[in-house]
């Protein structure tokens, strides 16, 4: 959460990034100051977006600081603490829930994008989610379009770039 709040401090106006409410109703808020980069923003989200990335996505949405593009997020909005016992065993205990600046609990619900765009499952299967070429990533292309930019071309390796220059 600390890294999420630091990132939010760079791109969001002053206010609450996330609040946490424990079982007794005690609320803790993470706030940021008013110095930030006010730039157009489109943030890609999907079912793999969970926890801190959902907190940041919710703060961006609630502050009207950018558009969320993709599919619904995972929905992990709980704070867990690890307990270790003398015998070496341990367990995780849920101690609180995360809430977006507007007060929305995202646990087991997720966050809906502003613009829904599915990924091409054939491309994901072929390349893998982390190696999807830019020109096969419909979510990225839609985000670029929404920002008024030029579509991103597939990145060439240094050898491919050198070969293209020689032609």
Regions from the PLM with identified roles:
Residues 11, 41-44, 60, 103, ...:
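Terminal peptide-recognition signature
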Residues 34-38, 61-62, 85-87, 99:
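Extracellular/periplasmic catalytic domains that process cell-envelope and extracellular macromolecules
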Residues 63-76:
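Short, well-structured beta-strand/strand-turn elements
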Residues 20, 117-167:
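C-terminal recognition in membrane/secretory proteostasis and scaffolding
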Residues 80-84, 91-125:
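Conserved P-loop NTPase
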Residues 1-51, 78-84:
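Gly/Ser/Thr-rich loop/hinge elements
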Residues 3-7, 52-56, 65, 102, ...:
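Stable alpha-helical elements in mature extracytoplasmic
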Residues 9-16, 49-50, 61-65, 144-152:
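Sec-exported extracytoplasmic/periplasmic mature domains
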């Amino acid at each position: 959460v600390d890294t999420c709040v630091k990132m939010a401090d760079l791109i969001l106006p002053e206010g609450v990034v996330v609040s946490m409410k424990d079982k007794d109703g005690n609320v803790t808020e993470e706030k940021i100051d008013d110095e930030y980069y006010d730039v157009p923003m489109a943030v890609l989200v999907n079912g793999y977006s969970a926890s801190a990335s959902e907190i940041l996505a919710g703060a961006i949405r609630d502050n009207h600081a950018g558009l969320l593009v993709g599919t619904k997020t995972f929905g992990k909005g709980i704070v867990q603490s690890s307990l270790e016992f003398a015998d070496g065993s341990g367990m995780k205990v849920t101690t609180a829930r995360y809430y977006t600046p507007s007060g929305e609990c995202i646990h087991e619900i997720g966050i809906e994008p502003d613009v829904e765009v599915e990924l091409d499952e054939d491309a994901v299967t072929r390349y893998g989610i982390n190696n999807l070429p830019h020109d096969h990533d419909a979510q990225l292309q839609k985000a670029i379009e929404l920002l008024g930019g030029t579509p991103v071309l597939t990145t060439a390796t240094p050898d491919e770039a050198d070969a293209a220059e020689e032609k």
